[in-house]
C-alpha cells in the first residue's frame, strides 16, 4: 500500500508538472528592431567604418539572412507600412491605409503570441494605431507613437513618449523624456525582463528603437564617435541622382540638398554611424539584462531594421527608392536550440516572413491572415531556398524584381519610363 501511495504521489506530481509544461516549453522571444539602418552598417558584415560589437556578437551566435527585403511602400514614410507588414505577416498591397491602422481581421504577431499564453510587452516605436497596439501588448512603457522625433523639439534628446494605457485611449499618458530615446527604451526593456522571467509564462519583448533614424544632429554622451575625415565613402556615392525618380523633393532628400560633396557625406555618415553605435550599446545593455535573468538559453532573439537608407549611394539621402540600400534590411535570428552559429544564408526573403517563422519556432498556429513564408526550413538547414524572386514597389512610380543575382527596376515618372538592370554580385 505504501508503495502504491508513493507511486500515486509521484504520478500526480508529474501530471502537475506536465500540466504547466506546454507554456514553459515555448521559447521566450526578444525582438530588437531598429529604424533606418542600412543592411551593411555592421562591422561583422564587412563595414570598416562602424563599431557594432553587440550586433556583431548576435551575428556570431545566430543565422543572418543577408538578402532580406522590406516589400516597399506606397507612401514616403516607409517605416509605417514596413512595420505593419512585419506585425501582420502581409505584403505591401495587403496592409490597410499604408499601415496607419491595423484592423482586427489582421491578427498581429504579438496578438497571436498573447492568445497562446505569452506575456507581451513593448517599448519604443509603434507606427500604427493605439487599438492595434493594445490588442498586441498586455504591457508597455516609454512608448513612442509616430514616425520620428521632431528636430524642433530636441529630437531624440527629449522624446515625447507614453506610459501604457489599459483603456487604449492614450489621452493623458504622454510625457517628455529626459534622456536619449534609445536609453529610455532599453531602460524599459530591462525593467520588464527583470520581472518577466519570474512569471510562469513565456514572454515576448518588443524593443523598437527609433535610432539611427534622424535627427542626427545631437548624439548622446555614450557610444563611439566618428571623425568625418576617417569615413570611407560608399563606392557608389554620387553627388546627385542621375535622373528624376519621382521623389527627389521629399523631406529626406532635403536634409542635405543635392548636389552633395564627398566631404558633406562624410560629415553625415560620421553622425549616422554615431547613431548606429549608440543603439548598439543599448542593445548590449538589454542583452546583459537578459543574461542576468538566466533566460538567455530559453530565448529566441531577433534583430532587424524596418527599412534601410541611402547615405550618398546613387546620389540619394533617403529611403524612397528600390535600391539595395533602401529596401534591403539587416535581419538575424538566434534560436538557442539550434546548432547553427555564425551562419549566413543568401536565400531571398521578406522582412514580414518573420511572423510565420516565429510562430513556427514557438509551435503555435499561423493565422490564416498571414501570407508570409516561414523561414524555419532555412534555420534548420533542410533547404537553401524558399522564394524564387522578390517583388518590390514604391509609390505608383517605381517597381522592381529580383531574381537570382539580378535586379530590374522600372520607373514611370509623369509618363517617362526609365529602366535599370543590376548584377547584384558585382
Which residues does each PLM region occupy?
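Formylglycine-dependent sulfatase
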Residues: 2-3, 7-12, 20-419, 424
Amino acid at each position: 500500500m505504501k508503495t502504491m501511495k508513493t507511486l500515486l504521489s509521484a504520478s500526480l506530481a508529474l501530471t502537475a508538472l506536465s500540466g504547466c509544461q506546454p507554456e514553459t516549453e515555448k521559447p521566450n522571444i526578444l525582438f530588437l528592431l531598429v529604424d533606418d539602418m542600412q543592411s551593411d552598417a555592421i562591422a561583422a558584415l564587412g563595414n570598416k567604418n562602424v563599431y557594432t560589437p553587440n550586433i556583431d556578437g548576435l551575428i556570431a551566435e545566430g543565422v543572418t539572412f543577408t538578402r532580406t527585403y522590406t516589400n516597399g511602400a506606397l507612401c514616403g514614410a516607409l517605416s509605417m507600412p514596413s512595420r505593419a507588414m512585419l506585425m501582420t505577416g502581409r505584403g505591401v498591397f495587403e496592409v490597410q491605409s499604408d499601415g496607419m491602422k491595423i484592423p482586427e481581421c489582421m491578427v498581429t504577431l504579438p496578438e497571436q503570441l498573447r492568445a497562446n499564453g505569452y506575456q507581451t510587452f513593448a517599448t519604443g516605436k509603434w507606427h500604427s494605431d493605439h487599438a492595434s497596439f493594445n490588442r498586441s501588448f498586455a504591457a508597455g512603457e516609454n512608448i513612442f507613437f509616430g514616425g520620428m522625433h521632431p528636430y524642433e523639439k530636441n529630437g531624440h534628446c527629449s522624446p515625447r513618449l507614453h506610459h501604457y494605457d489599459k483603456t487604449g485611449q492614450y489621452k493623458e499618458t504622454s510625457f517628455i523624456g529626459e534622456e536619449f530615446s534609445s536609453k529610455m527604451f532599453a531602460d524599459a526593456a530591462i525593467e520588464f525582463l527583470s520581472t518577466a522571467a519570474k512569471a510562469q509564462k513565456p514572454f515576448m519583448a518588443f524593443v523598437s528603437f527609433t535610432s539611427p533614424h534622424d535627427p542626427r544632429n545631437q548624439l548622446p554622451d555614450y557610444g563611439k564617435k566618428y571623425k568625418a575625415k576617417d569615413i570611407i565613402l560608399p563606392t557608389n556615392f554620387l553627388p546627385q541622382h542621375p535622373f528624376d525618380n519621382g521623389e527627389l523633393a521629399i523631406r529626406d532628400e532635403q536634409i542635405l540638398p543635392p548636389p552633395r560633396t564627398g566631404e558633406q557625406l562624410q560629415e553625415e555618415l560620421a553622425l549616422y554611424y554615431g547613431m548606429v553605435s549608440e543603439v548598439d550599446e543599448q542593445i548590449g545593455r538589454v542583452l546583459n539584462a537578459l543574461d542576468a535573468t538566466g533566460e538567455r538559453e530559453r530565448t529566441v532573439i531577433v534583430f532587424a531594421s524596418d527599412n534601410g537608407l541611402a547615405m550618398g549611394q546613387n546620389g540619394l539621402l533617403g529611403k524612397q527608392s528600390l535600391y539595395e540600400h533602401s529596401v534591403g534590411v539587416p535581419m538575424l535570428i538566434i534560436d538557442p536550440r539550434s546548432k547553427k552559429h555564425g551562419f549566413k544564408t543568401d536565400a531571398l526573403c521578406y522582412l514580414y516572413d518573420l511572423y510565420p517563422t516565429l510562430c513556427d519556432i514557438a509551435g503555435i498556429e499561423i493565422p490564416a491572415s498571414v501570407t508570409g513564408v516561414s523561414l524555419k526550413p532555412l534555420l534548420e538547414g533542410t533547404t537553401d531556398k524558399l522564394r524564387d524572386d522578390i517583388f518590390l514597389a514604391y509609390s505608383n512610380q517605381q517597381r522592381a524584381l529580383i531574381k537570382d543575382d539580378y535586379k530590374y527596376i522600372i520607373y514611370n515618372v509623369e509618363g517617362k519610363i526609365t529602366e535599370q538592370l543590376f548584377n547584384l554580385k558585382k
